[in-house]
C-alpha cells in the first residue's frame, strides 16, 4: 500500500485528470473561493466577454476589504473614486452572477480570510484557491489552499476547476518548551528567520510537533498565514479535536448526521506514518523570546533582547546587500538594540492578527494603561462579527480608554491603499504580515510583532519587552 502525506491525499482526492506523465501537472476540482474588490474585476470582465456564468455561485463569496475605509464613521462606499468604482463593480458582479457579497454595513463583512473561516466556509480536506497569497492560512484547518492570479480566478468561476502544478512536500516539526508571552507570531517569525525568505519555495509545508498541537486554532491561523513569507505556496496542519470544536455550529459547517460523517472523514486527514517528504526540518523553540522585525522582510527579525545583526557577518553577498539596504531604509545601525527603539504608531489588525484571541491578549496588556505621548494607535478587528464580539466583552472600552482608535473591519494599514496610510519617517510597530518598503506608506518604517508586543510598545513609546511590566 502506498503511503501518502496529508497534502498528497487532499490533492489526489481533488484530481480530475493528470495532465503530465509524471503526475505533476493536473486538472483539479476547487471546492470554494473568496473574491475581493481589488483582485477580481478582470476575471468577471472575461466571463462577460465570453458569455459565461459562474459555474457554482454558492461556492463563491465576495467581500469588500482591501480598499474600504476603516474609519468609525465610514459610509457604504469609499470616497476615493477608483476605490468606489471597485466596490460597486464587485457588488454588481455578485448581483449579476448570483454570489453573496459583503459590503460595508453588512453585519458579516470583514477581511476575506477572517470571514471565510468564521463562517465555516473552510473545512478540513478542502482544496481552495483565491486571489491573495495569504489564502495559505486555511491550512490551519486542514485544507490545502493557495493564492491564484486573475486568469485562474476566471477559469475557476467558469468551471470550478484549475490547472494545478503539484508541490513538493516539506515537513517542519516544531518542538521545545514555549516560553512565557511567546505567541504564534513569535514562533512563525522565528521559523521564517530560520528557513529564510525562500526556504520553502515550491513546497507545501506541513507543520507538526508538540508545539503545534499545543496552539489554539486561531494561533495556528496566524502561523499558516505567514508561511508564505518563507515562500511556501501552501501550508497545512492535520486537523484535530480543537479544529472540530472550532468549526462545529458555524454557518456553513455540516449539521446533524452530516456533521458526524464529516468528522469521521476528517479524522483520517493526516500523513501516513511512513509517508516520505522531500524535505524535513526540526525547529526547537526552547529559549525563544518575543520577537520583532528590524528590516524590510519578515525573515529579518530578532528577539527582543538581541541586537540588529551586522551585514559584514553575512557571507552570502546577496543577503549581505539586502541587510545593508534594509538598515539604510529603516534608519538603523548594525549592533543597535531593537529594544528601546522609539515608535510613532502602533497597529493591530490584518488577516494575521485580528481575531478575537488577538484582541483579548492585547487588551490584557493595555488594561489600565495609556498611550505614550506622541504615539498614535488604532485597532481594526478582522470582521464585523469579531468587532461585535469584542464590544460585547468590553474589549473596545479597554482600547479606547488607553487612547487607541477602535475602527471598522478591513485590511486597513496592512497595505497603504485604503486611506489608512502613514507618512515618510513614521515608525510603526504592527501586528501584520509584511514589512516591505512602502507597505504602510511611502518611506514608512514597519516593525512586525505580536499583538501583545504592539500593545506594550504603544504605552511605552518604544519597542519594549511585553514580559517587563
Where are these regions (language model features)?
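Fe-S-dependent hydro-lyases/dehydratases of central metabolism
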Residues: 1-469
Amino acid at each position: 500500500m502506498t503511503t501518502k502525506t496529508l497534502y498528497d491525499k487532499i490533492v489526489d482526492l481533488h484530481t480530475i485528470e493528470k495532465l503530465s506523465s509524471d503526475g505533476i501537472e493536473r486538472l483539479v476540482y476547487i471546492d470554494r473561493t473568496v473574491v475581493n474588490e481589488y483582485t477580481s474585476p478582470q476575471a468577471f470582465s472575461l466571463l462577460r466577454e465570453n458569455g459565461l456564468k459562474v459555474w457554482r455561485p454558492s461556492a463563491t463569496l465576495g467581500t469588500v476589504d482591501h480598499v474600504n475605509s476603516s474609519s468609525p464613521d465610514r459610509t457604504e462606499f469609499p470616497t476615493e473614486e477608483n476605490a468606489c468604482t471597485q466596490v460597486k463593480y464587485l457588488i454588481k458582479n455578485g448581483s449579476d452572477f448570483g454570489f453573496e457579497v459583503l459590503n460595508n454595513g453588512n453585519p458579516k463583512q470583514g477581511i476575506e480570510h477572517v470571514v471565510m473561516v468564521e463562517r465555516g466556509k473552510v473545512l478540513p480536506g478542502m482544496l481552495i484557491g483565491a486571489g491573495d497569497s495569504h489564502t495559505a492560512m486555511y491550512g490551519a484547518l486542514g485544507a490545502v489552499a493557495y493564492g491564484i492570479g486573475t486568469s485562474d480566478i476566471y477559469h475557476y468561476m467558469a468551471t470550478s476547476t484549475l490547472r494545478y502544478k503539484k508541490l513538493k512536500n516539506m515537513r517542519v516539526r516544531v518542538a521545545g518548551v514555549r516560553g512565557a508571552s511567546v505567541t504564534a507570531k513569535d514562533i512563525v517569525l522565528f521559523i521564517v528567520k530560520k528557513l529564510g525568505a525562500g526556504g520553502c519555495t515550491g513546497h507545501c509545508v506541513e507543520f507538526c510537533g508538540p508545539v503545534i498541537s499545543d496552539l489554539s486554532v486561531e494561533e495556528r491561523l496566524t502561523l499558516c498565514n505567514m508561511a508564505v513569507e518563507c515562500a511556501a505556496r501552501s501550508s497545512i496542519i492535520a486537523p484535530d479535536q480543537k479544529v472540530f470544536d472550532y468549526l462545529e455550529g458555524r454557518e456553513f459547517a455540516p449539521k446533524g448526521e452530516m456533521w458526524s460523517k464529516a468528522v469521521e472523514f476528517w479524522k483520517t486527514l493526516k500523513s501516513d506514518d511512513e509517508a516520505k517528504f522531500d524535505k524535513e526540518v526540526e525547529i526547537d523553540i526552547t529559549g525563544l523570546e518575543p520577537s520583532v522585525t528590524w528590516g524590510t522582510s519578515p525573515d529579518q527579525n530578532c528577539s527582543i533582547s538581541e541586537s540588529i545583526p551586522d551585514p559584514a557577518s553575512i557571507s552570502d553577498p546577496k543577503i549581505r546587500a539586502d541587510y545593508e539596504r534594509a538598515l539604510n531604509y529603516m534608519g538603523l545601525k548594525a549592533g543597535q538594540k531593537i529594544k528601546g527603539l522609539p515608535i510613532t504608531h502602533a497597529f493591530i489588525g490584518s488577516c494575521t492578527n485580528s481575531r478575537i484571541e488577538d484582541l483579548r491578549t492585547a487588551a490584557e496588556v493595555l488594561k489600565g494603561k495609556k498611550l505614550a505621548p506622541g504615539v498614535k494607535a488604532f485597532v481594526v478587528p478582522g470582521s464585523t462579527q469579531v468587532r461585535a464580539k469584542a464590544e460585547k466583552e468590553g474589549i473596545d472600552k479597554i482600547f479606547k480608554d488607553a487612547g487607541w482608535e477602535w475602527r471598522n473591519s478591513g485590511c486597513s494599514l496592512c497595505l497603504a491603499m485604503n486611506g489608512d496610510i502613514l507618512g515618510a519617517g513614521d515608525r510603526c510597530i504592527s501586528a501584520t504580515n509584511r514589512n516591505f518598503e512602502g507597505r504602510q506608506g511611502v518611506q514608512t518604517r514597519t516593525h512586525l510583532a505580536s499583538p501583545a508586543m504592539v500593545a506594550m510598545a504603544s504605552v511605552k513609546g518604544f519597542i519594549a519587552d511585553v514580559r517587563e511590566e
